Amino acid sequence: LLPEHQIIGVSRNNNTQDRNTSWHQWDWLSGRSLELPNEEISTVIVILKPISFDENGYQTGYLKAAEIIIKNLNQSFDYQKLVVMSSTRVYGEKNGRGITETAAPQPDDFRGHIILEYEKIMRDQSKVEPLILRPSGLYDPKQKWMQKFMNSFEAKQHSLSSKESNRFDRNILAKIISNYVAQKKLAELSGIFICSEPPKIFSELFAEQYPDKNFEDFFIASNHLGKSFDFQKLIASNLMG
C-alpha cells in the first residue's frame, strides 16, 4: 500500500524494515521523547493495544499511552491529519441493533469505557479533528474462522454468547486508511466511522469454512441476537473506494 509515500512506523518493539517503511523503536512508557527524521508529517495513524487484558493493562495501553503520544506529537511535529483506531466495543447490548454513529455509546465493560475515554483524549488534545475508525471484530479472509480453536479442540463444546458475528475484513480497513492518506478529496473527512459488515450467523460461517464438519459437535449455539451496526455512513464516505 501507498508505494509513493514514505511511511515511518513507530513501535515499542518492532524494527522491521519494509520497502517504503522505516521503523523506529520508541517505548513511549520509558519517559524518552519521540525523535523522528521528519518534523512535518501529512498523516498520523495511531493504533494502540492493551499491555495486558486486565483493567490496568487497558488503562496503561490506551489512556497513559495516548496522553504521552499526543503530547509528543504536538510538541515536536506538524501533522495535517490524524487517524485514531478505536473499536465497536465502545457500544454495548443496550445500544441494540442497527447502531449508527449518532448513537451515544453505552459500553458493557471497562474495556469499552477505556477505549471511549482514549478516543476523547485524542479528540480533545489533537491539533486537528481526527478520523476515528470503529471496526468490529477484525479478521483475515485467508485464515479460517476460529482455526486455533478447531486445532486445539478436546471434545469440549464452546458456548457462544450470541447467534451472530460482527466482523470486518482487515484488508478493507487497510484500504480505508490508504485511501484517506492518498486521496485529497477525502482529506476533509473527520469524526466517527463504524467499520462493520452485515452480521453473519456463526453456524453459517462455520459451514462455509468446514463444510465436512457438524457445527453442533464443536459449539453450543445461542439464540441471542446481540448488537449490530449500520455502516451506511462509511459506504457514503467513499473511504472504501
PLM regions and their residue ranges:
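Catalytic helix-loop patch of NAD(P)-dependent Rossmann-fold dehydrogenases
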Residues: N95-I132
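Substrate-positioning beta->alpha
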Residues: L138, K144-K148, Q157-A182
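Mid/C-terminal beta-alpha module of Rossmann-like enzyme folds, strongest
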Residues: N171-L225
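Conserved Rossmann-fold NAD(P)-dependent oxidoreductase catalytic core, especially the SDR/UDP-sugar
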Residues: I68-D108
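N-terminal Rossmann NAD(P)H-binding glycine-rich loop of SDR-like oxidoreductase domains
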Residues: L1-E4
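N-terminal Rossmann-fold cofactor-binding loop
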Residues: G9-N14, W28
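SDR active-site strand-loop-helix element
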Residues: V10, I47, L82-T88, L133-P135
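NAD(P)H-binding glycine-rich loop region in Rossmannoid oxidoreductase-like domains
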Residues: T21-N72
